[in-house]
Amino acid sequence: NGIQNPNIILVAIESFSADFLTAFGNTGNLTPNYDRLANESIFFTNLYATGTRTVRGMEALTLSVPPTPGNSIVRRPDNQNLFSIATILRQKNYQPYFIYGGDGYFDNMNNFFGGQGFDIVDRNRGNPLSEDIKTHRYNISDDEVSFENAWGICDDDIYRQAIKYADISSKNKKPFFQFVMTTSNHKPYTFPNGKIDLPQGEREGAVKYTDYALGKFIADAHKKPWFSNTVFVIVADHCASSAGKWEINIDKHHIPAIIYNSGNNAEKIVRLFSQIDVMPTLFGYLNWNYTTSLYGKDIN
């Protein structure tokens, strides 16, 4: 019922637990923008992350596979040319980007995403890609950064990169896919001054800033000619403070996800849902026909 061949921006928000949202009982008004967008979107309320680290979320969202013992596939050697969402996107003439505000050398992210055919946008502080990877790498220059900590540039800045490359792709008349990884909602919880009414250095302030930056991103995107033909998938990589030594705490794997601006009616999906099902479900809403080796399924 919606747009069939839109641009797609997938935002993976760092450590964005479901219990930060008003919809799940939080009374701190930390996420007014996500709450508003959820009411206008397909909103998945019974979604669980596959792991407790960013690389597990990346693995689930791009490869659509459950977590395997040992290291995440993202971190492993010889992880190029796997069947991924990029395989499907390239079949449909999309150009996929991985946009990250740190140096994607960390956790082998660049070799993983580059090895699946994503062009890379990162801080590029001198850690080259493997010679086997033929995709492009674009540097986020110092003059494009307003605030940065050890993890990367602030969410305001990473979203400006997303808009920059969306503008470039739109001018080239080619549909684009972006995997945007944020970093602000992470210790030490620092972010630009003057944006929100909570102090730096605490989780609640980082969550509220993260939400502020998301709201500004959507507002800025709304002004662009490509907005009307762009679907936004906004999900967490994993929960905050979710790692444990002995058992899996289910509550610490509960994350939100929305599909916004798809042309479909807003609804809440309460069926049990995994991160590995997010992209197959999006493709279902887009009415795509494709041959797949993805393990995740269209929830519908």
Identify the residue ranges that each predicted region occupies.
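Solvent-exposed soluble domains appended to multi-pass membrane proteins
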Residues: 1-300
